[in-house]
């Protein structure tokens, strides 16, 4: 998993990784992307922060080191008996809006790629720090704030129950997928050693054909993408890089 870092010197306290007991899921609550949010929090004292931001395309940006205490779920009063900034990691999901931007609006929604990467990141952090699934909670569960809005009202295709089920699945009991799989109206390519789909990256087939996969792991077609050589390449209707 690629994690881009744009760390802020502000808006956090020093800590150690043995403090981590909870993972708190948020939504940004505005229309900015992950990198833009990291830049904002790195630009001065904001009175708030989070460890990670997950973008619309599934890319992940880190603003605060895991060991340090971000200011993401502090409040004067709490609903949760234990979870606080001092013992948690905060993950912010970038969010779209189709109408009203009020906190209580049902017009907020997540992109598929955002949710897929947030699940992957959460599972990675759970495994790394020994955080059980019942310690992955919403900002709403900590303070009562309507955050993350789509996971409080559960009015879209992406629900909190679905998210919890995805992070709770036992990877040892799941049959690892490998190679090309037709899913969700498109194609994914699963790496045999991990059972994870290629995301936000190129893949070369044995015949020398190159493909690009988005943040949800879906093969991209009829679009231009840049490669590591800095050049732009066109992906045909079959997803293959057009070389001539």
Please name every model-derived segment:
Residues 2-5, 12, 16-17, 82, ...:
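Basic/polar, cationic surfaces and motifs that engage anionic cell-wall
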Residues 172-244:
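Extracellular adhesion/carbohydrate-binding repeat motifs centered on closely spaced tryptophans
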Residues 39, 102-107, 196-199:
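Short, polar loop/linker segments at the starts of domains and inter-domain junctions
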């Amino acid at each position: 998993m690629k994690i881009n870092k744009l760390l802020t010197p502000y808006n956090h306290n020093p800590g150690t990784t043995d403090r981590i007991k909870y993972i708190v899921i948020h939504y940004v609550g505005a229309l900015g992307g992950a990198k833009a949010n990291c830049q904002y929090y790195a630009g001065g004292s904001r009175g708030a922060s989070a460890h990670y931001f997950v973008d619309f395309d599934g890319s992940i940006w880190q603003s605060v080191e895991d060991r340090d205490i971000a200011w993401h779920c502090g409040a004067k009063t709490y609903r949760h008996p234990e979870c606080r900034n001092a013992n948690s990691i905060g993950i912010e999901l970038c969010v779209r809006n189709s109408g009203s931007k009020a906190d209580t609006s049902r017009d907020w929604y997540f992109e598929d790629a955002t949710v897929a990467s947030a699940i992957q990141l959460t599972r990675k952090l759970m495994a790394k720090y020994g955080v059980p699934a019942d310690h992955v909670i919403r900002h709403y569960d900590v303070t009562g704030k309507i955050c993350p809005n789509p996971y409080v009202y559960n009015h879209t295709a992406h629900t909190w129950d679905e998210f919890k089920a995805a992070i709770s699945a036992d990877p040892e009991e799941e049959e690892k997928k490998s190679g090309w799989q037709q899913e969700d109206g498109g194609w994914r390519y699963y790496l045999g050693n991990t059972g994870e789909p290629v995301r936000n990256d190129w893949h070369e087939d044995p015949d020398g054909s190159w493909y690009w996969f988005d943040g949800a792991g879906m093969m991209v077609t009829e679009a231009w993408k840049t490669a590591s050589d800095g050049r732009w390449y066109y992906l045909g209707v079959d997803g293959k890089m057009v070389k001539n």
